[in-house]
């Protein structure tokens, strides 16, 4: 894996997050290089700048290398992006006191004089981001968007003009181009969240713009809903929850359970929270918070005493533009560490991804629950702490520190910090 970022005299060491990913993926692409090169070539100086969709901090670190006092506002929907950017700034000994992080769902602050963006894979999300910018950018503000040349076409430029202002693309460099958009100062209405029904499960679903399966039930979730695990589960995690539909149905099937929704996407977590409220699934017989919502890199920051007895998982195999299985690996490893002894990991995935090999290696067991021509549902049970793989022993072994049957009292507000008073 290449870790040395070098462009126009700027030298950085950049890693993806988590840094244990496979070696053929790097923490930046040529579009990051092109944006930095463009700023240096045009002798851009320190002005109030927003950076949006900076995957692992290449743009942020680049600007701070030019001027450590550069005032930057960073917006990302991915927790791994936030953690990766923070990691790379520390690795390169760059300051963070001029940085402001903003929520992908809240209003943007005023006063930006320049915006740098990476084109996201999800164009509905991109349109939403442009709409948000139209609320805070005065006429004449430059927005520079880096993208692969093959992703830039007439339709994309028209989308930018419709949602923010006139746009034109640079010449190609390293198979990338920089789009320059000039804000026209007109405020666009923000798109409304998509709401749709799943009548066979009596659920209403709301999706924000960066959530997978925008207006319909995806095929993997469908087969999972039809094949929920059997048992008496009291603490259930919907890991990589998306809009939360698996956790919502789990509450229908196991009404005495407490459900915990976790995703790397802040918009996904917000959608799951909205859907919990929309479907009114609280059981009056239970006390405390019956659902918690965590914006997290898998189960990285869950409190150490948390021991669910069921984890539902529909792993993504993309991280941005990259196709990778490291997310599934991390989900399975985190599930093994966190599950109580006897706990179940219930997974759906494309057949060709061969998740059964990973689960067998980690859990020492794997059962096929259901399958069709494209998808398979697999189940693995944590039956012994001794099943820990040698490479896992190099990391923090929570199983050696805690009794795997330790229960955490409800409410579960302690999962992401101190309990509420």
Swiss-Prot record:
Catalyzed reactions: guanosine(1835) in 23S rRNA + S-adenosyl-L-methionine = N(2)-methylguanosine(1835) in 23S rRNA + S-adenosyl-L-homocysteine + H(+)
Entry EC number(s): 2.1.1.174
Region (Disordered): 389-421
A Pfam short name: MTS
Keyword annotations: Cytoplasm, Methyltransferase, rRNA processing, S-adenosyl-L-methionine, Transferase
Superkingdom field: Bacteria
Annotated localization: Cytoplasm
Signal peptide, first to last residue: none
A single GO molecular function term of this UniProt record: nucleic acid binding
GO cellular component: cytoplasm
HAMAP family per record: 23SrRNA_methyltr_G
Family to which the UniProt record says this protein belongs: Belongs to the methyltransferase superfamily. RlmG family.
Protein task: Specifically methylates the guanine in position 1835 (m2G1835) of 23S rRNA.
Protein name: Ribosomal RNA large subunit methyltransferase G
Record organism: Shewanella halifaxensis (strain HAW-EB4)
Taxon lineage: Bacteria, Pseudomonadati, Pseudomonadota, Gammaproteobacteria, Alteromonadales
Gene assigned in the entry: rlmG
């Amino acid at each position: 894996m290449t870790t040395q970022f070098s462009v126009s005299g700027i030298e950085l060491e950049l890693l993806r997050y988590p840094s244990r990913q496979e070696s053929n993926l790097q923490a930046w692409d040529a579009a990051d290089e092109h944006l930095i090169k463009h700023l240096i070539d045009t002798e851009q100086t320190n002005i109030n700048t927003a950076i949006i969709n900076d995957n692992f901090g290449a743009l942020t670190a680049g600007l701070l290398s030019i001027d450590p006092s550069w005032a930057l506002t960073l917006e990302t929907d991915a927790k791994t992006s936030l953690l990766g950017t923070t990691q790379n700034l520390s690795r390169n000994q760059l300051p963070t006191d001029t940085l402001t992080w903003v929520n992908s769902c809240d209003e943007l602050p005023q006063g930006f004089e320049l915006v740098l963006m990476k084109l996201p894979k999800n164009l509905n999300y991109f349109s939403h981001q442009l709409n948000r910018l139209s609320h805070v950018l005065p006429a004449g503000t430059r927005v520079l968007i880096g993208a692969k040349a093959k992703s830039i076409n007439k339709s994309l430029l028209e989308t930018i003009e419709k949602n923010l202002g006139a746009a034109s693309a640079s010449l190609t460099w390293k198979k990338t181009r920089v789009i320059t958009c000039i804000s026209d100062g007109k405020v666009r209405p923000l798109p409304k969240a998509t709401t749709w029904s799943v009548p066979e499960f009596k659920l209403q679903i709301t999706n924000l713009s960066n959530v997978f399966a925008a207006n319909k039930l995806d095929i993997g979730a469908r087969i999972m809903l039809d094949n929920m695990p059997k048992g008496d589960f009291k603490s259930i995690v919907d890991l990589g929850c998306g809009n939360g539909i698996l956790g919502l149905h789990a509450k229908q099937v196991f009404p005495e359970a407490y459900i915990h929704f976790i995703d790397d996407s802040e918009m996904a977590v917000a959608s799951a929270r909205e859907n919990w409220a929309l479907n009114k699934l609280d059981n009056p017989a239970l006390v405390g918070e019956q659902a918690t919502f965590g914006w997290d890199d898998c189960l990285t920051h869950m409190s150490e005493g948390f021991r669910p007895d069921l984890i539902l998982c529909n792993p993504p195999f993309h991280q941005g533009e990259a196709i990778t299985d490291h997310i599934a690996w991390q989900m399975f490893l985190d599930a093994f560490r966190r599950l109580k002894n006897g706990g179940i990991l219930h997974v759906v995935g494309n057949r060709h991804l061969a998740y059964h090999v990973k689960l067998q290696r980690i859990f020492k067991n794997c059962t096929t629950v259901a399958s069709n021509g494209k998808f398979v549902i697999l189940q693995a049970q944590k039956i012994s702490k001794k099943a820990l793989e040698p490479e896992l022993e190099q990391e923090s072994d929570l199983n050696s520190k805690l009794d795997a049957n330790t229960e955490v009292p409800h409410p579960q507000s302690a999962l992401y910090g101190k309990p509420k008073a």
